Amino acid sequence: DQCNHRIMEWKRDATSGQVLTGGNGEGSGTHQLSYPLDVIVDKETDSLIICDRSNRRVVRWPRRNGTSGETIISNINCVGLTMDENGSLYIVDFGKDEVRRYRRGESQGTVVAGGNGSGNHLDQLNDPQYVFVDRNNSVYVSEWGNDRVMKWVEGAKQGIVVAGGQGQGNGLTQ
């Protein structure tokens, strides 16, 4: 619930939702969020990991009785995130046009897609939005700026266009 600065849980067939995190007004306190954009569940720690966009941070928030979150990554323009089978976190940094992988305990992360400035070359991203990681640790990134989806095989220096890349439109290649 981005504009209400909170994460809601809606159970199947429920008539109302429950506030899980935030809900204390917009702000930068440990009990607040500011325009959260994405959230995933970390099953190992039974917590939520949230892209707290306007606070430029990623926070971990306990799912049970959590009244505040813990900043796990600072100074990042996070718009999307996912986690692989090993518990590594992949975060889209919109401001740097890159995706970084953070293994548990890491604070800097490793660039796994983009990281060469904004652009349309195969080693660049332009306004990346969403990220997905498959079982082979290939990273898929959707780009708003290039109207394409890129696949970056683990260890690759450049990606492969797997969808779009032909400009905006409703054609089968767009």
What does each model-identified segment do?
Residues D1-T21:
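Beta-propeller domains
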Residues Q2, R12, E44, R53, ...:
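Short loop/turn segments immediately following the C-termini of beta-strands
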Residues H5-M8, R56-V59, D97-V99, G109, ...:
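Structural signal for beta-propeller blades
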Residues A14-L37, R64-N77, E106-Q129, G155-Q174:
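Gly/Pro-rich loop segments of beta-rich domains
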Residues D42-E44, D84-N86, D134:
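Structural WD40 beta-propeller signal
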Residues S47-I49, S88-I91, V139-V141:
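Conserved beta-propeller blade signature
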